[in-house]
């Protein structure tokens, strides 16, 4: 077992031709974040001293997307094989550290497997991650003598006998910095592909008398790479199935685990119920006894105890205290805050607005840049007119206010406590406590009125 410090190299220079996309392959998302970010996160969780990212195609987009402080960007201008990629990073290796080699398009590698690989690496030798496949066609085969790993033969260079070997190379390995630099300097491209294979260092290490220890991953999906969108979609479902299983075992009721997506992290209380086709993105917190209806999307939000979110509601960057009810078809945009027992009904939109304790906005309403007190009733069709074409302005509504249907509050405006606003009113001035306000035009009756007749 090695006790050395460790750095990680992530190979991410491939074009991803089979993705048929202008986006670099490793930036295609799995569970809401780029594939390569999953690998970077694993490296950081392992406590890597540095992460060397070998890039080529789409370097500008990679730099715009990835903002890790400890990333060292290494350019591979020509893609001449995995060994060539590692040669570009080699000048940054310290002799006394271990180097772990990972891939930006193998997103589900687990920290636990990598910890076992690191622990298994012999002093002066190599730790190698391998798997056995029923059909190993196309993969490099692991050769052994008396049970000991002696080398890796790529499929195109393998003999018929070697092609019968089922144990294959995943490409993930760990070796000492000084040894790795020495072996990389000896690589040649005398092979069927005309490339520099990192796998050739296995035979070099064996010839020098160093031990190579093979470790198997916990699950095959951990080492599955992505070369096309079909493979990416399959890994997405594998990942989501794993997350759903963990949540079910932790006490979350998923009505259909196959129709649930977690694209971030979820902290949850007890007796949480989640219906079908729900998507959770970013960092989501659900309190005890929260119920989420079918088709909801919740992103970067905290939902308090006993809240119920009815179907097809969207909640983003919002905060809900206990016992709030939302939807169906409600939209809470960034900055929405509901205090205890508040209700937002169907086709109500909130942004940068706070709804007080026990207050209700039941139907067809827009509340933006607003502070609304406790026990307020917002009638159907109410709009806070917060934008004058250049700037946003605030609406403040006190406690115990009744706002009638089809009311427009033209900000900036303040409504005092206990105010009653009649239906159809346009509020343009501040209102003192306990006033009744109405601004309707006189109702006109025209007897004997005849509707226009359509011309034929």
UniProtKB/Swiss-Prot annotation:
Pathway participation: Nucleotide-sugar biosynthesis; UDP-N-acetyl-alpha-D-glucosamine biosynthesis; N-acetyl-alpha-D-glucosamine 1-phosphate from alpha-D-glucosamine 6-phosphate (route II): step 2/2; Nucleotide-sugar biosynthesis; UDP-N-acetyl-alpha-D-glucosamine biosynthesis; UDP-N-acetyl-alpha-D-glucosamine from N-acetyl-alpha-D-glucosamine 1-phosphate: step 1/1; Bacterial outer membrane biogenesis; LPS lipid A biosynthesis
Keyword terms: Acyltransferase, Cell shape, Cell wall biogenesis/degradation, Cytoplasm, Magnesium, Metal-binding, Multifunctional enzyme, Nucleotidyltransferase, Peptidoglycan synthesis, Repeat, Transferase
Residue ranges of the region described as Linker: 230-250
Iron as UniProt keyword: no
Top-level taxon of origin: Bacteria
Annotated region (N-acetyltransferase), positions in chain: 251-456
Compartments reported by the entry: Cytoplasm
Gene3D superfamilies: Hexapeptide repeat proteins, Spore Coat Polysaccharide Biosynthesis Protein SpsA, Chain A
Record protein name field: Bifunctional protein GlmU
Organism from which the protein derives: Klebsiella pneumoniae subsp. pneumoniae (strain ATCC 700721 / MGH 78578)
Taxon lineage: Bacteria, Pseudomonadati, Pseudomonadota, Gammaproteobacteria, Enterobacterales
């Amino acid at each position: 077992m090695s006790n050395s410090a460790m750095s990680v190299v992530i190979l991410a220079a491939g074009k991803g031709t089979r993705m048929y996309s202008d986006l670099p392959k490793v930036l295609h998302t799995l569970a809401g974040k780029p594939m390569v970010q999953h690998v970077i996160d694993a490296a950081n969780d392992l406590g890597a001293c540095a992460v060397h990212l070998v890039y080529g195609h789409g370097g500008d987009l990679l730099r715009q997307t990835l903002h890790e402080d400890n990333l060292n960007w290494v350019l591979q201008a020509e893609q001449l094989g995995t060994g060539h990629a590692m040669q570009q990073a080699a000048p940054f290796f310290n002799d006394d550290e271990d180097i772990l080699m990972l891939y930006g398009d193998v997103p589900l590698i687990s920290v636990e497997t990598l910890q076992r690989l690191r622990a298994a690496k012999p002093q002066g030798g190599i730790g190698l991650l391998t798997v056995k496949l029923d059909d190993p066609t196309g993969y490099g085969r692991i050769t052994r003598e008396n049970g000991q790993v002696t080398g890796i033969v790529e499929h195109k260079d393998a003999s018929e006998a070697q092609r019968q070997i089922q144990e294959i190379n995943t490409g993930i390995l760990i070796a000492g910095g000084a040894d790795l630099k020495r072996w990389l300097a000896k690589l040649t491209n005398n092979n069927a592909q005309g490339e520099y294979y990192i796998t050739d260092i296995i035979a070099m290490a064996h010839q020098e008398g160093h031990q190579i220890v093979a470790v198997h991953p916990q699950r095959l999906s951990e080492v599955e790479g992505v070369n096309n969108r079909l493979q990416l979609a399959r890994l997405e479902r594998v990942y989501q199935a794993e997350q759903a299983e963990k949540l079910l075992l932790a006490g979350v009721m998923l009505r259909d685990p196959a129709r649930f997506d977690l694209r971030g992290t979820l902290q949850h209380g007890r007796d949480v119920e989640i219906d079908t086709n729900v998507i959770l993105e970013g960092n989501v917190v659900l309190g005890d006894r929260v119920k989420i209806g079918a088709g909801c999307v919740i992103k970067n939000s905290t939902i308090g105890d006993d809240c119920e979110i009815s179907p097809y509601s969207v909640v983003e960057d919002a905060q809900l205290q206990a016992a709030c009810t939302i939807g169906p078809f409600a939209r809470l945009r960034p900055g929405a805050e509901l205090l205890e027992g508040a209700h937002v009904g169907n086709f109500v939109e909130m942004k940068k607005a706070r709804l007080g304790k026990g207050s209700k906005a039941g139907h067809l309403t827009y509340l933006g840049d607003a502070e609304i007190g406790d026990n307020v009733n917002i009638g159907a069709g109410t709009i806070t007119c917060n934008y004058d074409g250049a700037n946003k302005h605030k609406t403040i509504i006190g406690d115990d206010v009744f706002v009638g249907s089809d009311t427009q509050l033209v900000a900036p405006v303040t409504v005092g406590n206990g105010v009653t606003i009649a239906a159809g009113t346009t509020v343009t001035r501040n209102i003192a406590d306990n006033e009744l306000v109405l601004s309707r035009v006189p109702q006109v009756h025209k007897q004997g009125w005849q509707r226009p007749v359509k011309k034929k």
